[in-house]
Every structure is written in structure tokens, then in C-alpha cells.
């Protein structure tokens, strides 16, 4: 531009002289000199312009050459932005990202060849950003982030099909088991078979159904392996990618998906992306400035305060702190005012309890002009939706989750136990019970990871519960010593531990029973036996020195079997499957709501096809007038309790059928452009695209994992009610098919009570009892219904299985999480006649989620083992396992 301006200036000057020249131009020496200078300068400028143009072309070429770096950076930044929807605390600003990006370019390994330099920058930048982000993620989200990043990188490089990602995430969720090819063998779970049918639609697995027909024994052998992801996939190993192998692992052995995902990530972008990176508070501090605070995200059992205190001590800097809460803002302001002047550190703890002050901190750090170079601000907070986003985006995030496992739990407890505490009571019973109490505390905490089979509700048991129990035990043993007693008062001990201290947090009745069972197991006379093993390999140390206890704890296994909690080894499968389910849900929830679908189709086209398919299957609603007349013709008339129940079920199912039909038709109209796509229709479009159930349907119906299983349930419910209405009472009832199963059981009791009118039974004295048909029967084997009571079917046992030959509960088979219960005889008896010995009262729930709203009743099942065994196993009956 400067060169062009210079030429223009010379031209203007020359024209000016020419226009103002007088006489003969050739006699004007000065004009001729200007003309020569202009010519020479113009030549020089043109040469420089040519050089500049050539240089510009080279720069443009170099820019294009380095475009893959910018492309990778863009891809990762948008992933980070999407991932903030997983947890509001995962905010990262564009400014932060650019700083990491520029630093990564500077730090990447140099290379002579531009192509190699570009590869070095991309790899270094990708890993640098990954390290920066993952240290601020909770453990459960780290693999998810790495998997999403790997998928995006491979899709961008055309090495992975978005269609395959969709199939991996959604599986056979939109399929119906009755509309796909029949399973070759019964050992294949329905869910697995639906997922396999979904795989068949991809290019790599187009012949997988034929493979199962040909090589079913090989597939069975692969399915039964402990780690199938490490072994060749039958028929497919040589022709599938690591991602496709992960797809088949998820379809067949969902519990091994995360291990397969690690192998896929390691193969695609490097093993370092799946290796655990230990927390480094000092390295984090080195990245901060007085204007960039560190936010430590808190989780159960984690507190980074000690690490920060140790670093401050190492750096010889004063650290002041305050735990936020009502009225603590004044103290915090004073601490910060002093620290910014003197160059000290401040830690604000539990700031989720002082969000207004956090907004003030954001403004202060944004507008502050001069802060002491040594000043640093540390913040600890639990995730909170109202936490200031601006403060999150200017901060470095850090997580420091507590180690998991029995050894880690006992280690934490004995980091708190001191030698003075050990010496507080000069009796070995005190040290025995102190260790046992710490052991029980770890048991109840670690059991939470198994989901509903662990605790129905996830309780926040913490150090204060342990501390209260330890204080009680110390007082109790001291009193025992003073009174010269030989042993503690065990009923008092178990009551205080299970009902008062830990029980104060427990709100579910079956969780209370579990806590009582644990307390009774560990706190009895056997607990005073020196050297007792609380579980094989977990011996109570016989010592008076706290260091011996700590040494024994360090020698314990790093991981433990579910059996230590009283659970079946299969519970590990439950734990891993739950983790996979959460990972997949997280990925689906972060996916953009629009974009390409499978086979190049848009989401609207895919949903339109789903709507058409469902509308072709949806049953007609019952006609109220016709149903009313048919109810009158049923035995006993329309006032019989079970007939009243039938009428109520028909009314509720009609609401669902009408709602579903209306939603599907309106969606088709909206997709066609003749109806506005708004409100519930937007949600329905999104949910159906992801093989999920629209929220408006869930509000009025039942829980289900996918739209396929939900719709199958709708058809089966309609079939049961329609057959009952047309043909009279069925021989057996599918309990899962009722909106109100409690009402059904109550109606059954009322009818039994009426049958005993001559015996003058009072309805309040009638209770429900049950027994499994012996020999066990399927519905097809029943000839008639029960004369008194009802046959019920469709229930599944979780945590054990039913042995038909021995007619009792027994342990589950390996890898069988749920087993069908044979037909159950359910009737009513007087309270005084109910059998209570030799039975386990199995709680029964609608779905796997064992909340109070899903609880139906308890069914007594015969057992030769103590019922406490099944309580600790978490045994329950489920109406639906999807």
C-alpha cells in the first residue's frame, strides 16, 4: 500500500509540474530531472511491488499449509463449549483457549519440514488443551470428554462415519423385539439383540445376523468371556476398526464398553489421552496471575485445602481463609484487601453458599488495576447453576476427588485417627471397635457406587457421621470400663449407629433395613475377637500403635470384590453398565439439536419416518360407551373391585393412546410446514430423533429406556386390557402392564375378603402373601385362574435367582443381572396366619430405579438362607428391566 501511495504521489507531482510549466518543456531542466527521478522511482517501486506480491503469495500459501492447525483448534474449542452443558462449572472462555493455543504453538517441537512441524503443533496443542480441560473435570466425565474429542477428530478426518456414532449411541432404541428377526438362541438378551439389529444397518456389520445364525456357539463363547474386548470378534475381527469393535462390545457386553473405549482412544489419538494424570497444585499455581483465581470443584469426601496449605508453606507465603456462608462476606473482603497489598494468598471455601459475593469478586478482579504480584485467590465450590459464568471463564478449574475403594476409605479415616485418640480408652475393645467403625463407614460410603442395588437413595454419608459414632463408642467403652462390664450393650450400640447417627440421613425404609443389617453384622460379641477378619483379607490389627493400623491398611488390596459389601460379584457388571449408560446419556445430551442424521437424512426426515411407523402400529383407543357396556357383562358386574380397576386402567390408557396419536400427527404436520414447531413438539422431535420418549408422554405414562421398549409396552398393555374386557378375567395378570399395580393388589385383597364374608374377616386384618408356583410354571402352563387370589407374572429378580427344583432363592448365575420369576400365586390372608419364617420379603418396584414412587409392595419368597443375606445382596423384584 505504501509503495502504491508513493507512485501516486510522484504521478501527482509530475502532473502538477507539467501543467504549470511555461515555455519549452525540453528547456525546463528541473522538470526533466523530476521526470527521470519519477521513472527510476517507479521502476524501483514496481520491483518492490512484485517482490511484495510474491512474498504475499508465499505467506498465503504458508497460511493455507497451517490451516489444519486452526481447523483442529476450532474443532476442540467448540467441543469445550458444548461440554459446558454437562456441568455449568466447565466454562472456558475463548480468551483462555487462545492463550493455550498460542503457547502450544510456541512449545511444539520444531521441525525442518513444514508438514512435520504442522503435525507436531497439532499433537502438542491437542494434548495441551486436553490436559488443561481434564484437570477441571470430575473423574466420571474425563473418559467421556476424551471419547467425544476422538470422535470429532476422526469424523473431521473422514475416518469415522457420523452414522456409526449415531448407532453406537442409540443402539436399537427405536426397534421393537417383535418386529426384528427372531433370536437364534434364548441366551441372547432382548436388548442385545435389538442393538445387534441396529448394527446390521451399518456397512461393517451388514451380515452380522447371518453370522449369529452360522456361528452362534462362537458368539456365545465370546459373550461369556471376562474381557471380550481383548479377544478377536467372531467373523469380524479382520475387517472392523477399533470404533466398530467398540460398537459390538457395547451391543453385546455393555459393561466392557469403557475398556473398549480406552483402547479405541489410545489407538486413534494416543495412549496418553486415557492415562490418569495426577493432580499438581504447584503446576496449576504457576499458570495463575493475581487476576486469575483457581476454582477447586468439590465432590463428596474431597477437600484441596491441605494441598493449598502445603504449597503456601513451601513458597513461604501467608495463606488466610474463610468458609463462606451468611455474614462471611465482610471477613472475606478484609482478607482480600490485606492480601492484595501484602502479596498473600486467600482461600474462600464453600463459595456456593455465598454466590452474591462471588459476583462481587468477578467485578473486582475484572476492574482491579494494581494487585500485588504475589497475591493469589483460591476458591472452593460445589457445582451450582447460579455460579457466575464470568468468574468461571476467567479462572483455572481444578478437581481433586477423593480416592475410591475400601483401602482409600480406611486410609482417610485413619489419617483423622490420632495416637491420642487410640490411647483415649486403655482397653483393646476400644481399638477393635474403632477400626470396625471406620470399616463400616467405608462400607456404607463405597456401596453407593453400585446404584440402586447398593442404596435406593444416594446418601451423603460423611466424616461427621463417623465422628459422631466414634465419640459415642468412646463414651460407651469408657462407661463400660467404669462399670467393670465385660462387653458393650450391643442393642444400644447398633441402635445408636444405625438408627440415630447414620439413620438420621436415611429416608427409605429398605435402606434403613440394610443399615440395621450392617450394624448387626459388625457390632456383636464376635467384634471383640482379637485378630477377627471382617472379610477375608481385612483383619482388625492387634496393636496399640496407630502407625501399625496405617501400615496394615496400606497393605490392603487396591480394589475389592462386591462381596465385601454383601453383594453378588455380578454387582460389578451393574456398576460398569451404569457408568456406560451415564457416559452415553452425557454424549447424547451435548449433541447439537440439529444436523445430519443417518444415511444423509435430516433429523426431520428420520423423525417423520418414525412417526409414520408408530402411527401404523398405535392401537385404536377404547370407545367409552362400548367399554362401559362390556364391563357390565363381566362376571360379578361392574362393581367388582378388579372390574373397577380394569375400568380405571382403560381410562388411563386411552389418555396415552390419544396423546401419542395427536403428538405423532402434529409432528408430521410440523415437519411438512403446515403447523408451527413449538413447545412440546420441539421436545418430541428431539426425543424421537434420539430414540427417547417425549416428556409429555412420560408425564402421563410409565418410565422406559427407549421409545422402542415404551411403544412395545403400550401395545402389550392394550392387548391385556382388551382381552380382559372381551374374554373375561385372564388366568394370570401381567403386573407390569398396570398404571396402578398397588390398586390392583388392593382390589385382589378386597375380593378375597368378600369371599370370606361368612368368616367375618375385617379388611384391615387382611394382608397380602405370595408363593412361587411349584413346580414353577409359565403363563402358558396355567389351566385356570386362582379360585382365591390371582396369578401374577412378568416380574424379574435382581441380585439373585429362583431355583425351581429346590423352590427357593439362590445366588445369581455369573453375568445374569436379572432373571425372570416364574408365575407367582398372590392372595390375601389374615395377619395372624401369614408365614414370616423362612421367607424374604422382596421389595417390588416398577423399574430399576428404586425410589418411593416406583415402590409397589413386598412379596414374600421362600429362602433357606438368612433374609439378611438377601438384604445385603440388594435383592428386589422389578416389573421392568427394559
Task: Give short role names for the model-derived ranges.
Residues 3-74, 407-521:
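Conserved AAA+ ATPase small/helical "lid" subdomain
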Residues 31-127, 677, 681-748, 754:
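Proline-directed phosphorylation-rich, low-complexity intrinsically disordered regulatory regions
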Residues 91-341, 543, 549-552, 559, ...:
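Extended, compositionally biased accessory segments flanking or bridging domains
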Residues 133, 192, 199, 213-214, ...:
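Long C-terminal appendages of very large multidomain proteins
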Residues 278-284, 307-308, 331-335, 362-366, ...:
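Eukaryotic intrinsically disordered and solvent-exposed regulatory patches
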Residues 298-301, 350-352, 379-384, 401-403:
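A short beta-strand-to-loop transition that corresponds to the Sensor-1 phosphate-sensing loop
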Residues 313-321, 334-341, 345, 350-379, ...:
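Conserved catalytic/switch belt of AAA+ P-loop NTPases
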Residues 387-405:
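A short helix-turn-beta junction within AAA+ P-loop NTPase domains corresponding to the substrate/partner-engaging
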Amino acid at each position: 500500500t505504501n509503495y502504491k501511495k508513493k507512485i501516486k504521489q510522484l504521478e501527482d507531482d509530475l502532473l502538477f509540474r507539467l501543467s504549470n510549466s511555461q515555455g519549452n518543456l525540453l528547456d525546463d531542466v528541473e522538470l526533466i530531472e523530476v521526470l527521470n527521478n519519477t521513472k527510476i522511482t517507479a521502476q524501483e517501486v514496481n520491483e518492490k511491488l512484485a517482490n511484495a506480491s510474491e512474498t504475499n503469495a508465499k505467506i498465503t500459501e504458508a497460511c493455507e499449509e497451517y490451516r489444519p492447525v486452526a481447523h483442529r483448534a476450532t474443532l476442540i474449542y467448540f467441543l469445550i463449549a458444548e461440554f459446558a452443558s454437562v456441568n455449568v462449572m466447565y466454562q472456558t472462555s475463548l480468551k483462555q483457549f487462545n492463550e493455550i493455543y498460542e503457547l502450544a504453538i510456541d512449545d511444539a517441537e520444531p521441525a525442518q519440514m513444514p508438514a512435520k512441524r504442522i503435525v507436531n503443533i497439532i499433537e502438542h496443542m491437542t494434548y495441551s488443551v486436553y490436559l488443561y480441560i481434564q484437570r477441571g473435570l470430575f473423574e466420571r466425565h474425563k473418559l467421556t470428554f476424551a471419547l467425544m474429542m476422538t470422535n470429532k477428530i476422526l469424523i473431521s478426518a473422514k475416518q469415522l462415519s457420523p452414522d456409526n456414532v449415531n448407532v453406537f449411541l442409540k443402539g436399537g432404541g427405536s426397534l421393537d423385539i417383535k418386529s426384528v428377526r427372531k433370536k437364534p438362541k434364548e441366551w441372547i438378551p432382548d436388548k442385545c439383540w435389538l442393538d445387534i439389529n441396529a448394527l446390521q444397518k451399518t456397512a461393517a456389520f451388514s451380515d452380522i445376523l447371518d453370522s449369529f445364525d452360522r456361528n452362534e456357539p462362537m458368539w456365545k463363547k465370546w459373550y461369556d468371556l471376562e474381557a471380550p474386548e481383548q479377544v478377536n470378534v467372531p467373523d469380524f475381527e479382520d475387517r472392523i476398526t477399533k470404533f466398530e469393535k467398540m460398537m459390538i462390545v457395547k451391543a453385546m457386553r455393555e459393561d466392557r464398553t469403557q475398556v473398549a473405549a480406552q483402547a479405541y482412544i489410545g489407538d486413534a489419538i494416543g495412549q496418553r489421552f486415557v492415562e490418569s494424570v495426577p493432580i499438581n497444585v504447584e503446576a496449576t499455581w504457576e499458570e495463575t496471575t493475581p487476576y486469575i483465581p483457581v476454582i477447586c470443584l468439590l465432590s463428596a469426601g474431597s477437600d484441596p485445602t491441605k494441598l493449598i496449605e502445603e504449597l503456601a508453606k513451601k513458597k513461604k507465603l501467608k495463606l488466610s481463609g474463610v468458609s463462606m456462608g451468611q455474614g462471611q462476606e465482610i471477613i472475606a473482603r478484609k482478607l482480600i484487601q490485606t492480601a492484595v497489598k501484602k502479596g498473600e494468598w486467600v482461600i474462600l471455601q464453600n463459595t456456593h453458599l455465598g454466590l452474591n459475593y462471588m459476583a462481587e469478586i468477578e467485578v473486582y478482579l475484572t476492574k482491579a488495576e494494581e494487585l500485588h504480584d504475589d497475591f493469589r485467590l483460591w476458591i472452593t465450590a460445589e457445582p451450582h447453576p447460579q455460579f457466575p459464568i464470568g468468574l468461571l471463564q476467567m479462572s483455572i478449574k481444578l478437581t481433586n476427588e477423593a480416592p475410591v475403594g475400601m483401602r482409600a476409605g480406611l486410609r482417610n479415616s485413619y489419617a483423622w485417627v490420632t495416637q491420642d485418640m487410640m490411647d483415649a480408652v486403655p482397653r483393646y475393645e476400644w481399638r477393635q471397635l474403632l477400626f470396625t467403625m471406620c470399616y463400616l463407614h467405608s462400607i456404607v460410603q463405597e456401596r453407593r457406587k453400585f446404584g440402586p442395588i447398593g442404596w435406593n437413595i444416594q446418601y451423603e454419608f460423611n466424616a461427621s457421621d463417623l465422628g459422631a459414632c466414634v465419640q459415642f463408642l468412646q463414651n460407651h467403652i469408657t462407661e463400660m470400663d467404669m462399670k467393670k462390664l465385660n462387653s458393650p450393650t450391643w442393642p444400644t450400640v447398633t441402635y445408636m449407629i444405625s438408627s440415630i447417627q447414620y439413620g438420621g440421613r436415611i429416608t427409605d425404609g429398605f435402606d434403613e433395613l440394610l443399615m440395621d443389617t450392617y450394624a448387626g453384622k459388625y457390632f456383636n460379641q464376635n467384634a471383640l475377637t482379637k485378630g477377627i477378619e471382617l472379610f477375608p483379607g481385612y483383619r482388625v490389627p492387634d496393636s496399640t500403635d496407630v502407625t501399625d493400623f496405617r501400615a496394615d491398611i496400606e497393605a490392603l488390596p487396591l480394589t475389592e470384590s462386591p462381596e465385601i459389601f454383601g453383594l453378588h460379584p455380578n454387582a460389578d457388571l451393574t456398576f460398569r453398565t451404569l457408568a456406560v449408560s451415564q457416559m452415553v446419556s452425557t454424549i447424547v445430551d451435548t449433541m447439537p439439536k440439529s444436523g445430519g442424521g443417518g444415511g444423509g437424512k435430516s433429523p426431520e426426515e428420520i423423525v417423520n419416518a418414525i412417526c409414520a411407523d408408530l402411527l401404523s402400529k398405535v392401537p385404536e383407543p377404547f370407545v367409552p360407551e362400548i367399554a362401559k357396556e362390556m364391563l357390565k357383562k363381566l362376571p360379578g358386574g361392574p362393581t367388582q373391585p378388579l372390574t373397577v380397576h380394569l375400568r380405571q386402567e382403560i381410562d388411563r390408557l386411552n389418555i396415552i393412546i390419544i396423546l401419542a396419536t395427536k403428538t405423532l400427527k402434529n409432528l408430521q404436520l410440523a415437519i411438512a410446514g403446515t403447523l408451527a414447531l413449538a413447545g412440546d413438539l420441539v421436545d418430541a422431535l428431539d426425543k424421537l430423533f434420539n430414540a427417547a420418549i417425549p416428556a409429555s408422554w412420560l408425564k402421563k405414562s410409565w418410565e422406559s429406556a427407549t421409545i422402542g421398549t415404551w411403544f412395545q409396552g403400550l401395545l402389550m398393555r392394550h392387548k391385556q386390557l382388551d382381552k380382559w374386557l372381551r374374554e373375561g378375567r385372564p388366568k394370570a395378570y401381567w403386573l407390569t402392564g398396570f398404571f396402578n399395580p398397588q390398586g390392583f393388589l388392593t382390589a385382589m385383597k378386597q375380593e378375597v375378603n368378600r369371599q370370606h364374608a361368612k368368616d367375618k374377616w375385617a379388611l384391615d386384618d387382611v394382608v397380602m402373601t405370595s408363593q412361587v408356583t411349584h413346580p414353577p410354571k409359565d403363563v402358558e402352563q396355567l389351566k385356570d385362574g386362582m379360585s382365591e387370589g390371582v396369578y401374577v407374572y412378568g416380574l424379574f429378580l435382581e441380585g439373585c435367582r429362583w431355583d425351581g427344583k429346590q423352590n427357593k432363592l439362590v445366588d445369581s448365575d455369573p453375568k445374569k443381572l436379572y432373571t425372570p420369576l416364574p408365575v407367582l400365586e398372590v392372595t390375601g390372608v389374615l395377619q395372624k396366619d401369614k408365614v414370616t419364617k423362612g421367607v424374604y420379603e422382596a421389595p417390588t418396584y416398577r423399574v430399576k430405579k428404586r425410589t418411593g414412587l416406583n415402590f409397589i409392595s413386598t412379596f414374600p419368597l421362600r429362602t433357606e438362607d438368612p433374609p439378611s443375606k438377601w438384604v445385603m445382596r440388594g435383592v428386589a423384584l422389578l416389573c421392568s428391566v427394559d
